[in-house]
C-alpha cells in the first residue's frame, strides 16, 4: 500500500520553498483515502506516470473523495497516468432509483476544494465509484487533454462536476461515462468548455438547480466545438419544480455536433428524477440570456429540441440560430416542444422551432 509514501512525499514537497514535483513512476500502486493539503510554500507538481488504484471495496473509503486536493495554489498534475477508482462492483450500490433512501454515497475519484491557478493535463480517471471529478470552491483551474472513462451502465459517474467555482476551463478532453459528461452546479461562473468529445453519457448539463436553499447563481457558461455521441441528452439546462429561488444566465452553446443523441437541445424546468418531487408547482429558477448556435446532427428521439420553461418565470432572452437536427425513426421527422418561452430564431431551423401548436403561451 502506497498511501503513506505518497502522503509523506506530498508533505515534504509542500513544505519546500522552491518549486518541486512528486514522481509516481510507471506501475500499479494501491492507495487508500488520501488528502493532499495546502497551502504549500511554492508551486507543486504531481507527475503521475503509473496507475493509482483505489480499494475495490467501497466501504474502505470513508468520505466523499478518494483523492482529495484541498487549498492548493499553483498545482500541476500531469504525466499520462491513471486514477483507477475500481468502481465496477460498487455501481449497483449507487442506484438511487432502485435503492431509494438507502442509496449509498460512494467516493469520487478526485475531489478538488479551493484549488487555484492550477492545471490537470494528460491524465485519466477510470471507473470511479461516483463522480469522477468534483470541483468545489476553485478558481482559475484548467483540465486539458484530460480523459474520463467508465461504462455506459455505470451509475452516477458524472465526468466533471463543478460548483461554486470561477474560471474553470475544460479543453481537448474525452469523456465516456454513465452520467453527465460535465455537470455545472450552483455558483458556477465563467466556465469554458471547448473541444470536448462526450459519449456515452448524459451530455453536458447545467444543473440540476433549485433543489436546495441558498444556491448561488450560475453565470457565464460557454460550450463550444464539442461532439456528443450516443448520449441520452446533448446540451441541457435542468431545474427542479417547486424549487428554491435561483438564477442562471449567459449560457451559450455553439458549434456542436450531435451523433445519435437522445434530446440534442433541452431546457427542462420540470426536472424530476424518480418522481421524488412535486411537479405541479413551477420552478422558481429564472433562466435568461441563453443561446444555441450552429448545432447539427442526428436525434434518436422525435422531439429533437425541447424547451420547457417555468410557468412562473418564463425563459427570457433565448436565441436559436442555425439548428439542423434530423430524426429518422418512427413518426418522423423531428419536432420541437416549447412551453413558456418565446425565443429569437435565426438562420436554418430544422426542426421548426416553437412554431404553430408547439408554442404554448409565454
From Swiss-Prot:
Against InterPro entries, the record matches this protein to:
Glyco_hydro_28 (IPR000743), PbH1 (IPR006626), Pectin_lyas_fold (IPR012334), Pectin_lyase_fold/virulence (IPR011050)
Q: Name one GO biological process term.
A: carbohydrate metabolic process
Annotated protein name in UniProt: Exopolygalacturonase
Q: Where are the PbH1 repeats?
A: 138-164, 165-186, 188-208, 218-239
Q: What is the lineage of its organism?
A: Eukaryota, Viridiplantae, Streptophyta, Embryophyta, Tracheophyta
- Please name the SMART domains in this protein's record: PbH1 (SM00710)
EC main class here is hydrolase
Q: Could you tell me what this protein does? A: May function in depolymerizing pectin during pollen development, germination, and tube growth. Acts as an exo-polygalacturonase.
